[in-house]
From Swiss-Prot:
It holds the Pfam family Ubie_methyltran. It catalyses: a 2-demethylmenaquinol + S-adenosyl-L-methionine = a menaquinol + S-adenosyl-L-homocysteine + H(+); a 2-methoxy-6-(all-trans-polyprenyl)benzene-1,4-diol + S-adenosyl-L-methionine = a 5-methoxy-2-methyl-3-(all-trans-polyprenyl)benzene-1,4-diol + S-adenosyl-L-homocysteine + H(+). The keyword Hydrolase does not apply. PANTHER family: 2-METHOXY-6-POLYPRENYL-1,4-BENZOQUINOL METHYLASE, MITOCHONDRIAL, METHYLTRANSFERASE. Coiled coil: none annotated. This is Ubiquinone/menaquinone biosynthesis C-methyltransferase UbiE. The gene is ubiE. Its EC number is 2.1.1.163, 2.1.1.201. Gene3D superfamilies: Vaccinia Virus protein VP39. It comes from the Bacteria. NCBIfam families: MenG_MenH_UbiE (TIGR01934), PRK00216.1-1 (NF001240), PRK00216.1-5 (NF001244). One of its GO terms (biological process) is aerobic respiration. The keyword Transferase applies.
Length: 245
């Protein structure tokens, strides 16, 4: 088959196939996504997200775009920070994840605008948001460079991008982490979500994602300044921050 190639986990696929394959994964895991996050990370994902929210330094009335917002953890935190006079958009390219997130927020009494949106072609005007966030979503995007440029475009001058993502763990822990990721994680997926294959992909996608320094350079290439990152849990995840000047 012709066309440009990209990776889907450890597999090589045509670029125009990847989005559909990623969609299948998240349609499958959406209903069990929150409980699997708690089990897989032993609850640490809540600590990582809390740190991300505290890093933002939002003020009342700010506008926030939560890309690949999934079940709404960050959107909820952003909404509390910007208040009723602010604006928080929950977006995701996957309709199943977006529905779970919207319904979960509604059950908590939060009515936020939602959009089924592709991060590589955001349906928002230039220079609009004070903050753009993407948590555990960038690694699933086919053209990460295009997505980062779109995030830059919709930010106001002085606005901030926060990227929370799995990254490169400290080397002494690689062996144990690989055993957990490739042996235990698919088993947990099968037992809890009845879906070992999707969680095998998630483990592989983490390994294929750019490391801390590579992602930092990608953000600089997209136009961001003052780019830096903070490792958490020995580098299992990293929070990258960049500013649009």
């Amino acid at each position: 088959m012709g066309g440009q190639k990209t990776h889907f986990g450890f597999s090589t696929v045509n670029e125009d196939e990847k989005a559909g394959k990623v969609a299948e994964v998240f349609h499958s895991v959406a209903k069990n996504y929150d409980i699997m996050n708690d089990v897989m990370s032993a609850g640490l994902h809540r600590v990582w997200k809390h740190f991300t929210i505290n890093t933002a330094h939002l003020k009342k009335g700010d506008k926030v775009l939560d890309i690949a917002g999934g079940t709404g953890d960050l959107s909820r935190g952003w909404a509390k920070r910007v208040g009723k006079e602010g604006e928080v958009w929950l977006t995701d390219i996957n309709s199943s994840m977006l529905t779970v997130g919207r319904d979960r927020l509604l059950n908590e009494g939060m009515i936020l605008p939602v959009s089924l949106a592709d991060a590589e072609k955001l349906p928002f005007p230039d220079n609009y948001f004070n903050l753009v966030s993407v948590a555990f979503g960038l690694r699933n995007m086919t053209h990460k460079d295009a997505a980062l440029k779109e995030m830059y475009r919709v930010l106001k001058p002085g606005g901030t991008l926060l990227v929370l993502e799995f990254s490169k763990i400290y080397k002494p822990l690689e062996g144990a982490y690989d055993f957990y990721s490739f042996k235990l994680l698919p088993v947990m997926g099968r037992l809890i979500a009845k879906d070992a294959e999707s969680y095998q992909y998630l483990a592989e996608s983490i390994r294929m994602h750019p490391d801390q320094e590579t992602l930092k350079q990608m953000m600089l290439d997209a136009g961001f300044d003052s780019v830096d990152y903070h490792n958490m849990s020995a580098g299992i995840v990293a929070l990258h921050k960049g500013v649009k000047f």
